[in-house]
Design a protein with these regions (language model features):
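Conserved short alpha-helical segments that host acidic/polar catalytic motifs at enzyme active sites
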Residues: 1-156
Length: 156
């Protein structure tokens, strides 16, 4: 079962994100990750080990973020691996997902997603690629989410 922790604050919140993920460890997971904004750029770090290992990677980089999201993943699409761990991060979009997108193959066709852009074996990545495309057309993320949500079938 996946776990998601997200925090927007005025101070660095990565320790709070990691502590939140640690509190979800009892649910079980096969990989974990954190993403956020640091120096106006998206960063991410992932692990297929314990959250403690993820924490060591983050501390080594000395990253600070006041807008962060963390995820523990129990794989439903794609085997447990660094590339399949969430958050799925693209140029302007970071996404985590708990559930199954049943029609992700159809969405690839509908939105004409180039197979060369697909890096993971997850159903979640298609959503990040669609968001990236729609960000070129719309400035308001809420419009993008509404447009995509109309077409997603599954549980999320």
């Amino acid at each position: 079962m996946c776990g998601i922790v997200g925090i927007a604050s005025k101070k660095n919140n990565l320790n709070d994100i990691l502590n939140g993920l640690k509190s979800l460890e009892y649910r079980g997971y096969d990989s974990c990750g954190v993403a956020g904004v640091s120096d106006e750029k998206i960063f991410f770090e992932k692990s297929i080990s314990k959250i403690y290992e993820l924490e060591k990677k983050i501390n080594k980089r000395k990253i600070q973020s006041n807008l962060s999201i963390g995820h523990t993943r129990w794989a439903t699409h794609g085997k447990p691996s660094i590339k399949n761990a969430h958050p799925i991060t693209k140029e302007k979009c970071t996404i985590v997902h708990n559930g199954i997108i049943e029609n992700f193959e159809e969405l690839k066709i509908k939105y004409k997603i180039d197979k060369k852009l697909i890096i993971t074996d997850t159903d979640t990545e298609i959503i990040s690629l669609i968001i990236e495309r729609l960000l070129k057309k719309y400035d308001d993320p809420s419009i993008i989410i509404k447009k995509i949500a109309k077409h997603i079938k599954g549980t999320y």
